[in-house]
Swiss-Prot record:
UniProt-recorded name of the protein: Large ribosomal subunit protein uL30
Keyword tags: Ribonucleoprotein, Ribosomal protein
A biological process term (GO) from this entry: translation
Family note: Belongs to the universal ribosomal protein uL30 family.
Encoding gene (name): rpmD
GO molecular function: structural constituent of ribosome
Length: 61
């Protein structure tokens, strides 16, 4: 029973972003460009990614 995993990499800085976008990056466990996290795919995570889609790169694993 393996769930899909997503590798989320922050590619841009949060300088100039809104408070909501900064909070979302922090909630994802990111903080600086080129940091990445591996998370299980779910609708909640997809919503967070949509908020900061211009700041991150997402790859399926």
């Amino acid at each position: 029973m393996s769930e899909k995993k997503l590798k989320i990499t922050q590619v841009r800085s949060v300088i100039g972003s809104t408070k909501k976008q900064k909070a979302t990056i922090k909630a994802l466990g990111l903080g600086r460009p080129n940091y990445h996290v591996d998370k299980e795919d779910n609708p909640c995570l997809r919503g967070q990614i949509r908020v900061v889609q211009h700041l991150v790169k997402v790859e399926e694993q």
